[in-house]
Amino acid sequence: MPSKESWSGRKTNRATVHKSKQEGRQQDLLIAALGMKLGSQKSSVTIWQPLKLFAYSQLTSLVRRATLKENEQIPKYEKVHNFKVHTFRGPHWCEYCANFMWGLIAQGVKCADCGLNVHKQCSKMVPNDCKPDLKHVKKVYSCDLTTLVKARTTKRPMVVDMCIREIEARGLNSEGLYRVSGFSDLIEDVKMAFDRDGEKADISVNMYEDINIITGALKLYFRDLPIPLITYDAYPKFIESAKIMDPDEQLETLHEALKLLPPAHCETLRYLMAHLKRVTLHEKENLMNAENLGIVFGPTLMRSPELDAMAALNDIRYQRLVVELLIKNEDILF
């Protein structure tokens, strides 16, 4: 007759095997959710969206904790150097090939973000390892997004983090949130505070009681980006997704468009869409649904690379739809 300890051990082993099989099935579901399709004679039935939703709901608490822990880490974003032709005073050597930089004027190029000095020919071979120095990055607004997060060693621009925290702390029930404009002079004050003080800028209720000033400062930050949050390179793919009529194919195309964004842009967009999704949960109080937020943020986050004014004007409705889709499907797409 088996002992009590032996019986307990068998029970534990069976439980372990059962748990392993269950986790294996959940992992299979997650793998399948990455875009599998079922073919038919005349059309294909896309199961990507509902399957991913189901797989997401099956995530174990262990996987959730691991995901959260991973998200807390500051990623190592790649950044190309911002080289400008430069005239050096006194003798200088190339920091790439170590050879002397000859000439009296325009002897080479210098990175405006990290200060790297190289020959013009060598600049084409320098890897994308720019590490911006704060003494070269003097502003927060109108600064390239990836440059800013690398210079300050943050996951997202501090403007985005701080403004969203303040808005969610005291403004989610404010009627017309993001639609109502704040006083422009005070919004400019917030901008100057961030440029001057960085993360030490005071945007609390004691300084700015009207939450529309904070929302205005956040929108201004995105408008002032030299490269929009949804970049010029990715813009056509996002617009293409908005023109697709089939919902599942539309989401797949949108998912592909997100892959075209630089990592820092994609992370900031993910964080913003999660926030806007929470804004829509208070729609009864603030009267702002995904469609209304799309109208506000479409032209703010996206700018057409085309110089043709009429073409850019025609894209406005698709820009609105892109943001609306990102908000509604935030938990699936990111």
From Swiss-Prot:
UniProt-annotated stretches for the region Disordered: 1-22
Site entry (Arginine finger), positions: R179
Modification type Phosphothreonine: residues: T67, T215
ZnF endpoints (Phorbol-ester/DAG-type): 80-130
PROSITE patterns: RHOGAP, ZF_DAG_PE_1, ZF_DAG_PE_2
Keywords: GTPase activation, Metal-binding, Neurogenesis, Phosphoprotein, Zinc, Zinc-finger
Biased composition range(s): Polar residues: 1-10
Function: GTPase-activating protein for p21-rac and a phorbol ester receptor. Involved in the assembly of neuronal locomotor circuits as a direct effector of EPHA4 in axon guidance.
The protein's name in its UniProt record: N-chimaerin
Organism name: Bos taurus
